[in-house]
């Protein structure tokens, strides 16, 4: 995915505010052998680009002053209640250095699985994106998780996920095999045809003679 940015000279709170008032979003691109570069991007174009999954999880081609460099999105700051981008950060990447990025998981085949189709289970994804490290050329836009073979007794953890060649998952914490989904069995309704159990009769009280 390609986008156009423009070099900016002024920085600071006042300059950024004036930039946003003119319909531009301030940003920075850093990393690699070159120095950090201040940039500005058309706010509306950036706003719509940020709605696309691919803009967050793939190598982007950024054009500045007629020169194109490969970058990844690293951070976006939004206004607390306005539809306004305050600042955006990009990092340069090169073909010889591995990148660390979050990649979305696409769950497929859920409705065709025995767990859902036959056993009426509810399958809930627990993880929606995965930290991965790989070479830029091997970075997938997303990772497909096939759920079509699941039954009510199935489990699916990270170690059971087939990753593309050259892609390695980054796991933090002591749990090296976190669950990716949960499977909930259907609730069993009480049998309405069963005869209610009669309560034992209370003993009769003896009257005075």
From Swiss-Prot:
GO terms for biological process: translation. CDD domains: Ribosomal_L25_TL5_CTC. This is Large ribosomal subunit protein bL25. Transmembrane segments: none annotated. The gene is rplY. GO terms for molecular function: 5S rRNA binding; structural constituent of ribosome. Part of the 50S ribosomal subunit; part of the 5S rRNA/L5/L18/L25 subcomplex. Contacts the 5S rRNA. Binds to the 5S rRNA independently of L5 and L18. Belongs to the bacterial ribosomal protein bL25 family. CTC subfamily. GO terms for cellular component: cytosolic large ribosomal subunit. This is one of the proteins that binds to the 5S RNA in the ribosome where it forms part of the central protuberance. Keywords: Ribonucleoprotein, Ribosomal protein, RNA-binding, rRNA-binding. Residues 190-209 are annotated as: Disordered.
